[in-house]
Amino acid sequence: LHVSFKKPSEEICTFFNIDPEKGTKCMVLERVRGNKEYPFVSFISYFNPNIPLTGDEDFTQPLYGVLENKYNIIVKTSKEEVSARLAGEFIAEKLDIKSSDPILIRKRFVYDINQVPIEYNIGYYRADSFTYTIEAER
């Protein structure tokens, strides 16, 4: 678990509707899920800079519970994109795989009950541990 404050990319600035020229920083939460022998996903979450996060929150607790209990932010909607690519050195090191191994990338765009963007989350999944299931009804 690693918490920092970083200037977001232009794509993330657009999502949060912030001016990239102002140098606004977002709180960034990075964590790897799985265990030491088999890490299967690396998450990087950027949070709306209008949320007064300090980085001292207890992120061992459920994230959306922290947002609701401490900041009265109720998460309602998420939209997702899934794509594939090779891991590259940075992600390969986190997931204990080769840089040439395939990974799946899931971008999740999270909104509160008022459709205010709350979290921009990127998940990098080992391709050998990810199944994406969709159910549709007419």
Where do the protein language model's features map onto the residues?
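All-alpha effector-binding/dimerization core of bacterial HTH-type transcriptional repressors
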Residues: 1-138
